[in-house]
Amino acid sequence: MINPTEVNSLIRLLDDPDNEIYDHVHEKLLGYGTEVIAYLETAFEQAFDAIQQERIANLVHEIQFSTLKNDLKLWHQSGAFDLLQGTLIINRYQYPDLDDQKVINQIEAIKRDIWIQMMNEASPKEQIKLINHVFYNIYGFSGNTSNHLDPQNSFLSQVLETKKGNQISLAIIYSVIAQKLDIPVYGVNLPKYFILAYLDESRESDFESGIMFYINAFNKGLIFGRRDVDMFLKQLNLKFDKQFYEPCSNTDIIKRVIRNLISAYENLGSAEKVAELNELLNILG
């Protein structure tokens, strides 16, 4: 239980010029975890001293980043079963105060609009055509071709707001919605491109022959076949590798999201963010 008087007294000492006192106060406040953030934010608004403001902001970020790392570690160690949860954890890196339920509700709304129109006997391609119609035509999602390196393309909440994303963020939303509708669509970690596969569930144990077709979520849900993947790999001078054709793990998907963010922030020259994102990448092995 936090003692407000003690916490506020510690916060007032954050601008102390004595480094030993500052280090002690910093560690003490850090130990409170997320409970102390509300007090720090109030103090930030009331602070006139630039050093104190900077130290408060850094401390808030440190607490939030530490919590994010712990949550990502727990998600990974628990089996990484929920792709949406993993994506929301990464989203908190840039938007720590966002209510996850808001994002979940947005995805549920899209799912519901598809479900209402879905026929029980629809074939796999008919199912995908309906998802494409609702996702791209009604909701207006599209690939961000004009600013592909923008880090916002990788943050789920922003993609849902702007309706623009990169290959992997659009594929994540698409596959999460499909799976909520019991449609077997999963991510495939193709080099330089992230695609989706529609599985023939009766042959799920053998992914290579159990894939009915592939889907390009970045290009309005375009359906294509194995030969197209063969040709793409040939253009890249890459030899056959089963992993380029088969669904990958949720951990692999989140690692790719983080790598995209690292590239985006390297492009912007944000060394601190690159270092922190590498920490997140290391958690996933």
Predicted feature locations:
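A structural boundary/capping signal
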Residues: M1-G285
